[in-house]
Amino acid sequence: MSDKFTVEIITPNKTILKAETNEVTIPSYEGQMGILKDHIPLITFLRPGIISLQDQEKKYYVEEGTVEFSNNNLLILTSTARSLADLNHSSIEDLISIAESQLSDNNSSDKEKYKLSYKISTLKEINQ
């Protein structure tokens, strides 16, 4: 009997990943969540952070989105998803700079500032 389940990461432009895995860690506003096979059904919101597939050592930077787990299928719908292997120091610095300028914009709502602060801290963590 396999301990694997299906995970899909989908952006508006394309499917980033469709794979079988043993465990996925996702960033949510409730904290980091570990998903294993036969997890209870779940719907939650993504915060900017890192999605990790433990058995494949794959990691993806994601921004906001939704997560649904049902019948051993994990569906991650996100505005942005990038493999950490594809991000370099310069591109991360550019993303941080853009987010910091958006954060300093006085027209941003508190909710938007909250999301941007998560994004900036995650990008800085990746960039170390």
Predicted regions and their residues:
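N-terminal export/targeting signal detector
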Residues: 1-4
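Acidic/glycine-rich phosphate/pyrophosphate-binding loops and surrounding catalytic core
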Residues: 85-128
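Compact, glycine-rich, soluble single-domain proteins
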Residues: 6-98
